[in-house]
Amino acid sequence: MSKQGNFQKSMSLFDLILIGMGAIFGSAWLFAVSNVASKAGPSGAFSWILGGAIILLIGLVYAELGAALPRTGGIIRYPVYSHGHLVGYLISFVTIVAYTSLISIEVTAVRQYVAYWFPGLTIKGSDSPTISGWILQFALLCLFFLLNYWSVKTFAKANFIISIFKYIVPITIIIVLIFHFQPENLSVQGFAPFGFTGIQAAISTGGVMFAYLGLHPIVSVAGEVQNPKRNIPIALIICIIVSTIIYTVLQVTFIGAIPTETLKHGWPAIGREFSLPFKDIAVMLGLGWLATLVILDAILSPGGNGNIFMNTTSRLVYAWARNGTLFGIFSKVNKDTGTPRASLWLSFALSIFWTLPFPSWNALVNVCSVALILSYAIAPISSAALRVNAKDLNRPFYLKGMSIIGPLSFIFTAFIVYWSGWKTVSWLLGSQLVMFLIYLCFSKYTPKEDVSLAQQLKSAWWLIGFYIMMLIFSYIGSFGHGLGIISNPVDLILVAIGSLAIYYWAKYTGLPKAAIDYDK
């Protein structure tokens, strides 16, 4: 039996930035620009700016939490500290679903691009894998598992090597496409042919939110970082600002480089005609060398992300077990390697599972985006509640303006959930309500030593209220097969008012005293 150990503090600020930027520049930039263009036209560039601004607000909140409480898997331990085990359990479930499926998305992206050279990997006329294509995905998952199984240092070194190449390619693409830029493309059918609704759709379902995934991995490895009180806030802010700039420029140069005659079919056709956008546009422009470079990067970028997310997810499973609402075996850390091997095995198994029901990149990205934003939404809530029930907590990074940034960031996360539409919200939030009922049915076995079940329920009703509110608004709203009873801007006003009320409800119904586990 492996000896129990502790996580090793071996990650520097540079490692953190590489992890954050690596998590952001995975498969999303290789697919999202054509999706965004098809939903928002030239105004899609503003989707990246607005999405980056929203993530920056949430990132500032995480910076305070991560610096004050540098915990491995912190993103699903903070809600336990502020609101108890029931809230932590619900957030843990949706976060693990999101991250295990993310690993699958990345290997699926690799297979779809490699199929350009080896068509036998993908079923003709679809994005689904053949048997050999699925075997390739499985082999990649095995590789990520082994890289993380042996040690934290092995993971960091592998991430560094991959990162060097994956950052060069987007910059090269930007430089090359500038020389093919056609300004008139920015006014075809108007700058914003679908209005603000198109920008909203691009953010929630076009891949914008999916692209900004660098927050969780940085916070999840907080317990393994050198000088976390300084390095976590710096890494978060740098990653968000730099990625927003690069994504926006990539979107503009892609739109500008599309041959103008191609746009005669309308913006919605761009998503179909450029399913592998940067490879397709390189071929269309006669830049075979660039197409080859993009495909090589399409193998390394998602591959590097899969490696990062395998690492991150194992830490999240570990944190869930530490919360007391998952089997204790998953809270064990190998003494020799500093890795939670049991958690890694579970992450590996779940990542294999998700390759089965969701065979393509587009099939999973919307669900993952909403699941991730639901896990992001807890950050401003926990931070606000901890300012009430943990006033003496040392906060090396004290976020000024929390009274404004906290409510705003929560409202924006609610907007993104709403924009994803009834089709996605119904089953995702519905499953959360089912998990709530399961927790109550098995409450005999849930942790109650520090916080009674009655107090856990009192501190969790706001979350159930939020889920029910979003289900109602999504059902009567106009996004994703809603009934269309309410439309813009009335729907957003109602969501904002309801979310603001729930924010303050959650802030003042946290635990009477924060249940902080000072054993990292």
From Swiss-Prot:
Cellular component GO terms, alphabetical: plasma membrane
Molecular-function annotations in GO: symporter activity
InterPro entries: AA/rel_permease1, AA_Transporter_AGT
Cellular compartment(s): Cell membrane
Topological type in the membrane: Multi-pass membrane protein
Biological processes annotated in GO: amino acid transport
Main location: membrane
Conditions for induction: Induced by sucrose.
Glycoprotein listed as a keyword: no
Keyword terms of this UniProt record: Amino-acid transport, Cell membrane, Membrane, Symport, Transmembrane, Transmembrane helix, Transport
Additional free-text comment from the UniProt record: Allows enhanced growth with L-aspartate as a sole source nitrogen source. Inhibited by carbonyl cyanide m-chlorophenylhydrazone and carbonyl cyanide 4-trifluoro-methoxyphenylhydrazone.
Similarity comment text for this entry: Belongs to the amino acid-polyamine-organocation (APC) superfamily. AGT (TC 2.A.3.11) family.
Function noted in UniProt: Uptake of L-aspartate with the concomitant import of a proton. Can also transport aspartate hydroxamate and L-glutamate with lower affinity and efficiency.
Protein's UniProt name: Aspartate-proton symporter
